[in-house]
């Protein structure tokens, strides 16, 4: 469908006829709506290429951003646990179907009205979730899939299989539209939670009746290798972060035990005239020494893991990882944390 825009000279000529009567008058809403609608439609994607051979389904990747907090705020703040867990050999994620008004999805619709929103899903990824192999396939094989990032509190990446589109860390509002037959591979999630809205775009009745050609999708082997390497790197990073969290929890427990034993020994020394069991004090001191040895060992091991994580995490993502590790502390005693964290530096 084409659009005819009047030339500048004709527009000026029409305007000059009524120049005296419209100087103080605001443009009519009807004209403003027409211009706005035209501009919006011209900015939209086109998923069908018109050629001499007919309508051909495009194999392009469309990247944009959306004001998701305004459009999908209720989905972002939804804490319901009605997601279905998918936990397979190389795939872990949570998913549930949702109903989204078409008006909120206008930005991913095509300008020619050849595709319509069919099914919508929310995909939630937690720390360690994601795809090490394979991809998520939703929707019509002759349609498109819009992947919209609603929330990302960690380091969340994705790869459109067979293309050069590899995102190591998606930002809130990032939107990617691709052929549904390609699928979407969510890379292993590092740190906090991420939520994606997946929209299946299916051919309209008008397009089906007109007819269209579905060409074979292209493939980028170098990108496949890069995505696999990145996925394995993220798996290693997650494993080291989990180890670091475990060491931190063990260290806090060791500091807690050390404080308790030291206080008990002080109590025994204060009442030395009453408590004459020197063997008891020797046992307590021995336990304190063992605890301090454990602390030293854990500190050395922790330093090694921190060095590994630093080498794997991108510099711009270190604050996200640091915040996630801090939130994972199990012992919440302020005194214990003060004693332990003042002597330990877990920041990457």
From Swiss-Prot:
The keyword Repeat does not apply. Transmembrane segments: none annotated. It comes from the Viruses. Induction: Expressed in the late phase of the viral replicative cycle. The keyword Kinase does not apply. InterPro entries: Poxvirus_F11. Pfam families: Pox_F11. Keywords: Late protein. Belongs to the orthopoxvirus OPG055 family. Stimulates increases in peripheral microtubule dynamics and may increase the motility of the infected cells, contributing to cell-to-cell spread of the virus. Seems to inhibit the signaling via the GTPase RHOA and DIAPH1/mDia. This is Protein OPG055.
